[in-house]
Amino acid sequence: MDSGIGLLAAAAAVRRLRPDADLVLSSDPDGMPWGPRTPEDLTGRALAVARAAAEHRPDALIVACNTATVHALDAVRAELEPDIPVIGTVPAIKPAAASGGRVAIWATPATTGSPYQRGLIRDFATGARVTEVPCPGPVSYTAQRCG
């Protein structure tokens, strides 16, 4: 699930790993992008999309959106698990910071600076110089051109 076309990359990865899997793609095209939304609004929209997906009785639900993961993952898990395992996606801070040096994290404004992302930086980027870059434009632009 995602607000828009971002879920296609996750679906392609699952398809490569499990070509036999039946995939249900659940999105919120009327509400995209989720990045500029408040955490409360985003959580409500993510729960609605997750409920729609859950009606299809999937083996698992992938929250293919960093913004939804950092703000709504706990709520989605509380509602669907243990019947449906819920898998979140977050910025790949740990592998990016593994060699030290400089790391730039480009994400929606709702993800950048969130307590969740700050925790990832604290826990996994101790030897790196991390710059958070809030970028609302690319998501909106891509959604308008490709969605």
Predicted regions: what is each one?
Residues 1-147:
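Non-catalytic structural scaffold of enzyme domains
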